[in-house]
């Protein structure tokens, strides 16, 4: 997965999508899945601005959902197929409903089914876990958060695939919330945040982290509902002025965080806070 040639989600890695309720995360995930179902790359208009690597070898594409009802999952599947211009569910695509299982059993099923479908289809092209926080008891439990992110990172390496983790939290500026957010911030190769645009008819997608590059190299992308198409469609990129405003707003947020507990900082203390907040090593 890439935007304008900047890689976001790659093999052996985790890729995180985060955002609040009603921002269109599930529809965005559906667009990514649609791009992974065909043997030729879909145009970015179909995949809401993302460049998704096609799947000519029909490797397994796995979608685990902990959030939605079975009826909603089925409805979203229909939209994904329509977006991919398919009339039937490919044999290599498996969408699994996890909401009815206990949290412990959800991870067990993910582990076992990944192994099963890897052998059945000769490999795994893509995995999506919609609702990673629902695999543990609390998103603020440090031990559990470290364990689940480490385990998913391990599975991505074993099966040489990209695992997309969807986190249903609103980020705090450029930081993800909770211990699970902190772990994903450290381990994920890329993080995209989806939020409502100033124009409420649109959602805006922003890069919070890009391992091989800068988040500011990734344009802010827009998508919105189209009545005639009966699905979300790509609405292009935000302007250069909006990009500059975003940069300014994020820097203001970092400075506010730096001075949250003190009105005065030494130069060394300020450098340490800025390096920590902006993950500069």
Task: For each feature predicted by the language model, list its residue ranges.
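The Walker A/P-loop phosphate-binding site
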Residues: 1-80
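Structured loop/turn residues at beta-strand edges in well-structured enzyme cores
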Residues: 12, 57-59, 122-123, 159, ...
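Phosphate-binding/switch region of NTP-binding enzymes
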Residues: 16-17, 22, 27, 126, ...
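Alpha-helical scaffold elements adjacent to nucleotide-binding pockets in ATP/GTP-utilizing enzyme cores
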Residues: 31-32, 72-80, 109-113, 147-151, ...
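Residue-level signal for alpha-helix termini/capping positions
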Residues: 38, 115-119, 157
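Conserved inter-motif catalytic segment of the P-loop NTP-binding fold
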Residues: 44, 53-140, 226, 249
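C-terminal regions of RecA-like/P-loop NTPase motor modules
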Residues: 58, 120-123, 197-281
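Helical mechanochemical/support elements of P-loop NTPase systems and associated helical scaffolds
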Residues: 69, 73, 106, 144-151, ...
